[in-house]
Structure formats: C-alpha cells, structure tokens
Amino acid sequence: MNMNKLHLSKSKTHYIIVVFLAILSLSIHPLCAQNQCSVPGLPTIRIATWNVKDCSATNQKTKEAFLLHSFIAEAIKEARIDIIAFQEIQIEGRKGADIALLQDALMSIDWAMPHVAWARSPLNDDLAILSRFPITESQTILAPSEQPWPRPVLEACIDLGDMLLYLYTAHFKAYADQESLSARLAQAQALASHIRQYFGQSIKETAIILAGDFNTVSSYDMQSKIGTVDLLQLRDNEDSTDDFLSLNLEWLNFKPTYKSKSYASITDHIIVSPLLAAKADKNSIEIIDPPPTDKGFSLSDHKILVFNLDPSRLCLWQ
C-alpha cells in the first residue's frame, strides 16, 4: 500500500514537472519570436549614390585635365561607404577607365571594393556599382533604343550575408523643358512597372533601393502621384502597402543635392522599398559635401547621398 502511494506520488510529481516545462516552453517561444529582430553587433552598411562627373576636371584657362580618382577614393573611405552607385563614370575603353582606376585607388588606401557592375550608356555617361559585398547578379535594363530616355538603368543583386539587396541606379534626362520632363516620366513609369512585375507580391518584404541622379529639377517632377518622384515611389495608385520612400525628401528637409554657380536643386535620391522604409528614420540618411581637391575645386557639383542600413533593425538576420 505504501509502495503504491510512493509510486503515485512520483508519477504525480513527474506529471507536474512535464506540464510546467511545457507551459514554460510556450511562454518563452513568443518572447524569442518577438526578439528575433534584434541582433546586436551587426555593423551598419552604408550605401551611397554619387554623380562623379567623369572623375576628372579641366582648367578652363589652360585646358589642363586633372584625374580625380585618388581624391574620390579618399572621399569614399572617409565616408566609410560599403556600396556606391555611380553616375557619369566611364567604363574602360570609352572616354576613360574610371572603374579600374578607382578600384586601384581604393585598394591602395586599404578600402577595397572588388565587386563591380556596370552599364554602358550611348551618351558615354556610364553607370556603375562598386561594392565591398559580393554582387551575385547584374544586368542592364530599360536600354534607350527607341525609348525617349537617353540612358539605361543598372540593376544589381548584392549578397549582404543573410539578405539579398536589389540596387537600381539610373541617370535620368536633365533639364526642365517638356521633352526632358516627358522622358523622365516615361523612364520612371517603366522602372516602376519593371519592379512591380519582377518582384510581384514579394515587393513588400524585399530590400530594394533606387539610387541615382533622377534630375528632378521641375516642380512637376514632385507632383503627387503623377510626378517623377511619386512614380519611382510606386505611389501612382491607391495601394499604399507597396509605397517606396525617398529618404532624402522625407528626412533632409529638401536640401539640394546639386549645386552650381547658377542654381541648386534636388536631383539625386535614395528611394527604398516598404521593408526598408518601415525601419528608416532621420538617422538613416545623410548628405555629404564632396571634399575639395588639392587644386581647390570640388570633386563634383553633386553631393553624396548615404543610406545607413542597420541590419539589427530588420527581421531578416535570424
């Protein structure tokens, strides 16, 4: 009788322990699920766009040309940029060999960017992406051909480790006349259509960045729903769940990204997909004045836009 009581007591105790552990497991699991988005220790990835104006300058009096690759490399390292989209850069065999010269200059100052993608432009103003992270795929899309725009778009897929980043860079047609505006609107609509078709429903959960010189110099470019910027932000419909966001328009108080002797304008943008926009704030975007050269002039009339991608704020590193 006593043995039976002892056996029943042990069984009861075992049962209570099992139930307790089960409850504890259920209570802990949601907590882990809530905290899995926070991954401390992951470094911020700095992604930039910059129109470098051929990586050269000419003395208008003497017509002497100055190559600026070493200065541009120093500016990239100083800003600690990991991935950069370039406009007005020349592919080897064209007007220059900017990509190779830049990579050499970066290597010489211990800031190697060995991964590169590029797209040729009929106007000799080529596009390129340099990266410290592997570029797994790249392609030229929206080639001008019979289209009204003068330059293509460069698309690249970059492996950030546990996440893929899709980066698009472009250099839209300049000037405020109606023909130039129409070309920008047409290319913006074509790029938005390409992105919608390529990503489908996954567009809301994918890291996508549009970074470049979109030459949004006209007030119409900024028009709600129908302007160049809102077309690129996919805001031309009633569905707000797939809206992209121009970080510099949102957080930099309309600071100009281009400045010449005659005027200043917001021509350059970093526009991010819903996944990245949801985690962005005023610290996610910055504008950097290009430093002067030893000759006293600036490296470019365009400023550098930089997006601080903080992986620890995304639910993708698990």
Q: Which residues make up each language-model segment?
A:
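Bacterial N-terminal signal peptides that target proteins for export
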Residues: 4-17
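N-terminal, active-site-proximal structural segment of metallo-dependent hydrolase catalytic domains
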Residues: 16, 31-108, 119-126, 188-189, ...
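Bacterial N-terminal signal peptides
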Residues: 17-27
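Metal-dependent phosphoester-hydrolase catalytic domains
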Residues: 34, 148, 197-209, 216-318
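Structural recognition of the beta-strand scaffold that forms the well-ordered cores
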Residues: 46-49, 82-88, 117-118, 127-129, ...
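Solvent-exposed loop/turn segments at secondary-structure junctions
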Residues: 52-56, 89-93, 121-125, 134-136, ...
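Extracytoplasmic, non-cytosolic globular domains
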Residues: 63-75, 84, 152-244
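Structured beta-strand-rich core segments of catalytic domains in phosphoester-bond hydrolases
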Residues: 90-172
